[in-house]
Amino acid sequence: MKSWISRPVPQLPGRMPAVRIFDTAVGAYSTLDATGEQSLYVCGITPYDATHMGHAASYVAFDLLNRAWRDGGQRVAYVQNVTDVDDPLLERATATGVDWRDLAASQIELFQTDMAALNVLAPDHYVGAVESIPEIVPAIERLLHLGLAYRVTGTPGEPDGDVYYDVEAASKHSAEAKDAWTLGSVSGLSETEMLELFAERGGDPGRRGKRQALDPLLWRVARDGEPSWAGGELGSGRPGWHIECTVIAQKYLPAPFTVQGGGSDLIFPHHEMGAGHAYSLTGVPLARHFAHAGMVGLDGEKMSKSKGNLVLVSKLRAAGEEPAAIRLAILAHHYRTDWSWTEAGFAQAKTRLAEWRDALTMAPGESAATLIAEMRSELANDLNAPGALAAVDRWAVAAKQQAGAGSPMDQALVSDAVNALLGVEL
């Protein structure tokens, strides 16, 4: 599947120091050593209701990491998936009378257009679940052969043969096992907390025939009226959610890759189970670090499809709003915090953008180098975008207070820095 096209990123003098991020799996900050090679996997959308502000905030957050690495002279391998077949997509297609493939294609196109408008750097590989089924099937077959997956007898009216991952068996390792996954390794949650979230986030803890309530689906055998694909010894069907990302990451990235990213709602079960699948398949951890973006609400309320209060990037753009201002409104909040989109906050972002542009024409001589150093220091510290924005604010105030003409060299350098590090074009 093709990705969108990235805009050129200006090259700046000097380099970003090694980036420190908060690692969810260890509950502490970790420094990402500047080894020269970095790798990033960010879980993509299920293509319906794209692109809401929660989506946008998550991809802008990890775009900051991508940019910070590149500014530090690192080569970055970046992969993003798209879950282009899943229950929510099929349910929306049925409810609206649209073929699920057409719905997915239109929403993927809209998402990519929004990402390009927000100046999010494109992944090197943008990979759909459907196109990955030929690799997913043998991975599930291997888990069956290893005794880490099992088939479930169908309930009345349902077919036999759905395949589930055995989390208890997968959590058992020899004393020599290195960096072995066990249930809770990523999330750090109690079983009670896991059960609650599992039911809320696509799991089926009450499914009869499962060995453990938290066992996730690997393969759903074919049902009438649902799309299905050849599954070898699994029978016709379609993959579960978590195994898709594991297989895609293992195909395109080193093992372990540097950072697994996504929204905080993916910590459990998605990232937890994906990490388990990876270790079960290869004996190697999926990722070295796990980082997560906060949730976005609207005017203090949870933003959700069911409430119908989604703020869509495409609707803002259609109303004539500038994508750079949308991006600035997102960057005003630290990526790990939960926050709400408000009209007041968006107005502040538009004012800030205008003030930066006004100040650019008055850029004081030899001011750019200090600003770049301050921005890099903030972004290297757990991608502290609000701190970087505050540094530009201070520079803009000083620029407006100076007498005389601005420096063309510093004007160009500040413009390049705000673009390269924050993804905002002045």
Curated annotation (Swiss-Prot):
Enzyme class (EC, first level): ligase
Residue numbers covered by motif 'KMSKS' region: 302-306
E.C. numbers: 6.3.1.13
Transport keyword on record: no
Binding site for Zn(2+): 43, 245, 270
GO BP terms: cysteinyl-tRNA aminoacylation; mycothiol biosynthetic process
Chain span(s) of sequence motif 'ERGGDP' region: 200-205
A Pfam family recorded for this sequence: tRNA-synt_1e
CC per GO annotation: cytosol
Cofactor note: Binds 1 zinc ion per subunit.
MF terms (GO), sorted A to Z: ATP binding; cysteine-glucosaminylinositol ligase activity; cysteine-tRNA ligase activity; zinc ion binding
Recorded catalytic activity of this chain's protein: 1D-myo-inositol 2-amino-2-deoxy-alpha-D-glucopyranoside + L-cysteine + ATP = 1D-myo-inositol 2-(L-cysteinylamino)-2-deoxy-alpha-D-glucopyranoside + AMP + diphosphate + H(+)
InterPro entries per record: Cys-tRNA/MSH_ligase (IPR024909), Mycothiol_ligase_MshC (IPR017812), Rossmann-like_a/b/a_fold (IPR014729), tRNA-synt_1_cat_dom (IPR032678)
Motif position, 'HIGH' region: 45-55
Protein name: L-cysteine:1D-myo-inositol 2-amino-2-deoxy-alpha-D-glucopyranoside ligase
Gene: mshC
